[in-house]
Amino acid sequence: MFVARRLSKNITQISKTAVKTSVRAVPVRGFKTTSVNQAAAPAPKTSQEKEYFEKNKSLLDKESNEESTEVDYSKLNENQGVVHQVIGAVVDVYFPHGKLPYINDALIVDDFQAENVEKVIEDLNNPSLKGKIDFNNVPISNIKLVLEVAQHLGDGIVRCVALDITDGLGRGALVLNTGSPLMVPVGQATLGRIMNVIGEPIDGCGPIPATEKRPIWRAPPPFADLAPSASILETGIKVIDLLAPYSRGGKIGLFGGAGVGKTVLIQELINNIAKAHGGFSVFTGVGERTREGNDLYHEMVEAGVIKKEGPGSKVALVFGQMNEPPGARARVTLTGLTVAEYFRDAEGQDVLLFIDNIFRFTQAGSEMSALLGRIPSAVGYQPTLATDMGCMQERIATTKKGSITSVQAVYVPADDLTDPAPATTFAHLDATTVLSRAISELGIYPCVDPLDSTSLMMDPNIIGVEHYKVATDVQKILQEYKSLQDIIAILGMDDLSEDQKATVFRARKIQRFLSQPFEVAHAFTNMEGRFVKLSDSIKAFKGILEGKYDHLPEAAFYMVGGIEDVEIKAAKLLESAGKEEKKTTTTSTTGQVKEETVREKVTRLVDEAYNAKVKKLKEYGASTAHLEELRAQYEKNFESEISQLEVLLKK
C-alpha cells in the first residue's frame, strides 16, 4: 500500500511539472518576448537551397526568433491569460499571476487591437471596478469569442466551454477575465428583436439599445416572495382546456416524439395566448431548426406581434439553434429566462415564456459533460442532470411582483417517457400535455393523449364541479372504449351489449371532437383555425355524453371548433349524401323516370347481392329451404342500416 501511494505521488508531481513546462512554452500574439535556446536550422544540401538560404538568411533568422520565444508574463495584468489548449468546444486558459476567474464567469478571447479594446483595458486596470469590465460600455460586436469557466484544473489553468465555434482559435491567444457571469441586454429594447446566447443581435437591424444588462446566472426568487396562482389560463384548444387545463403562472410541458406536432402546438399557443395577452412574451429557441425560427419571426411580423418600425412589439426572441456548439445551446435557455425575469421583477409584468425545446438544453448539457471528462450516468446523461434542470426551472416562478408562465416543448427520445431527460422534467411541471404517435396515425390533431395528459388544476375547488365532472366522464368513456378495442378487433361489434355499443359510438365521436383546426396550420390544411371558449367546450362534451348528438354522423365531429360547427358540418354531409341517395333514378317499364328512395335503393342492393349468391348456390345444388333462410338473414342485417339512414335524412 505504501509503495502504491508513493508511486501515485511521484506520478502526480511529474504531471504537474509537465503542465508547468508546457504552459511556459505558449507564445502570445502581440507581445515582444525574449529569445530562448532554439534548435539549429537544418543545413542546406543542394545548390538551390544554399542560394535561397543566403538570400533570405536575415528573414529566416527573424522568423525563427519570433516563433521560438518564451512569454514575458510581466506584460500581462492579473485579469489577463492566454489560451493553453483547444479541444473542440472546450478551451483551457492559463492565468500566470494566480488570480483565477470564478466558476461560470465569462472570459473574452480576441486579438485585442488597440482601437477595439482601449475601454476594456482601461476598465481592467481601474482599481475602482475591482477587475470587472463594465459590460454596458463594451460593444458586443467587438467580442470575438466568449468562454464560460467550468473547471479549475490547478497550476493556474481553468477549463472553459466556448459559447461559439472555435474555428481559427490557437494557443497563445489573449484572454480577458470579465470578473462576472455573461451579461445580456434586457428591457423593452429587446422586444421585437432576435438575439443569440451572448445578447448579440442576429436580425440584421443594428445593435440593441439596451440601457441595462443582467447576468444569466441568477438565484431563484426567495421562498417568501413566491405567490402561487390558482387561475386557469384559457388557450382556446378544447382538449387542453377541458382535460389538462393550464395554470396562469405555472410551468407547462408538451411531451412528444419526433414529428408529432410539438412546435405547431406551441406556435398555436403563441397565436392564441400571446396575441391576446396584454403583457410581454419571450420565445427561446433551444437547439431546434433555424427554418422554424425564421418562419415564426415572419409570422409574428405579419400578425403585428412584432413591429419592425417603431414601438409596440410584444415579444423578444432568443435563438441558439441546432447548428450551435453545445455551450450556446446549454446557455441560451438562461439568456431567454433572464430577459423574462427582468420583465417580471423590474416591470411587474405577467410574462409568457416559450421554450422549444427543453430536451435540447439537457442534450447540450450532456455533450458539455462528456467534453469536460465527467463520468456519465444513466443512458449517457450528465451526472448533474437533476441539478441542472432544477437550477433553471426554479427560476420560473410567480412572485408578488409578477409572474412567468412557461410553455416548454419536451422531445421524448424513442417515444419513451421513462427516459431520464423527460422524466426529470416531469417533476417540475404543473401540467403535462402528452402528444401520442398512435393518435397522430389516426389523423387526429392535435394528437394530445387525453388519458396520459395531466394537470394539477384538475380539482373541483379550482375549476368548478361541472367542469371536473364532465372531464372525468370524458376520460372514463375513453378508457372504456380503449378496453373494448381488443374485443371489437377479435369478435366485432355484434357481440357487444347495447350499452357497450352506445359507449363505443359516443367515445369515437368524443375522440374526433377533440381534434381542432389550427390557425398556424392553415397553409397546410386549408382550414380556418378555431378558438373555442372553455364554457362552450364543457357544454358540447356534456351533450355528447348525454346522447343529445347521437343522431349526428361521426364524420361531422372531425376537425371542427364548437358544437355549432358540428351541426353545420353534419347538415352539409347529409345534404351531399341526400343528393347522391335520393337523386338516384331508375327507368320504369313505361319509360318514365322516377326518383328512388333510400329504402328502395338498399332493397335493390340486397336483392342484387342475394341473387348473385343464389345463382352460385343453385350451381352447387342448394335446397329451397336453405335459400329462403339466406334471404331472411340478408333482410335482417340490412333493416337496421335502412332505419338509421332514414332517420338521418329526416333530420
From Swiss-Prot:
Catalyses which reaction? ATP + H2O + 4 H(+)(in) = ADP + phosphate + 5 H(+)(out)
State where it is primarily located.
Answer: mitochondrion
Gene3D superfamilies named in the record = 2.40.10.170, Bovine Mitochondrial F1-atpase, Atp Synthase Beta Chain, Chain D, domain 3 (1.10.1140.10), P-loop containing nucleotide triphosphate hydrolases (3.40.50.300)
Q: Does the keyword NAD apply?
A: no
The protein's superkingdom reads Eukaryota
Topology of the protein relative to the lipid bilayer? Peripheral membrane protein
**Sites where the protein binds ADP:** 259-264
- Transit peptide, residues from-to: 1-30
Which GO cellular component does the record give, naming just one? mitochondrion
Which InterPro entries has this protein been placed in? AAA+_ATPase, ATP-synt_VA_C, ATP_synth_F1_bsu, ATPase_alpha/beta_chains, ATPase_F1/V1/A1_a/bsu_N, ATPase_F1/V1/A1_a/bsu_N_sf, ATPase_F1/V1/A1_a/bsu_nucl-bd, ATPase_F1/V1_b/a_C
> Per UniProt, what is one Pfam family of this protein?
ATP-synt_ab_N
Signal peptide residues on this chain, from the entry's feature table: none
EC number(s)? 7.1.2.2
A GO term, aspect molecular function: ATP hydrolysis activity
Concerning SUPFAM superfamilies, the annotation shows: C-terminal domain of alpha and beta subunits of F1 ATP synthase, N-terminal domain of alpha and beta subunits of F1 ATP synthase, P-loop containing nucleoside triphosphate hydrolases
- Annotated TM spans: none
Alphabetically sorted, this entry's keywords are: ATP synthesis, ATP-binding, CF(1), Hydrogen ion transport, Ion transport, Magnesium, Membrane, Metal-binding, Mitochondrion, Mitochondrion inner membrane, Nucleotide-binding, Transit peptide, Translocase, Transport
* Positions that bind Mg(2+) 2: 288
Residue positions binding Mg(2+) 1: 263
Keyword set includes rRNA-binding: no
Residue sites binding ATP per the record = 259, 261-264, 289
The protein's location, in the record's own words, is:
Mitochondrion inner membrane
Q: What GO biological process terms does the UniProt entry carry, in alphabetical order?
A: proton motive force-driven ATP synthesis; proton motive force-driven mitochondrial ATP synthesis; response to mercury ion
Q: Which family does it belong to?
A: Belongs to the ATPase alpha/beta chains family.
Query: Function, please?
Result: Catalytic subunit beta, of the mitochondrial membrane ATP synthase complex (F(1)F(0) ATP synthase or Complex V) that produces ATP from ADP in the presence of a proton gradient across the membrane which is generated by electron transport complexes of the respiratory chain. ATP synthase complex consist of a soluble F(1) head domain - the catalytic core - and a membrane F(1) domain - the membrane proton channel. These two domains are linked by a central stalk rotating inside the F(1) region and a stationary peripheral stalk.
| Name recorded for this polypeptide | ATP synthase F(1) complex catalytic subunit beta, mitochondrial
Q: To which species is this protein native?
A: Dictyostelium discoideum (Social amoeba)
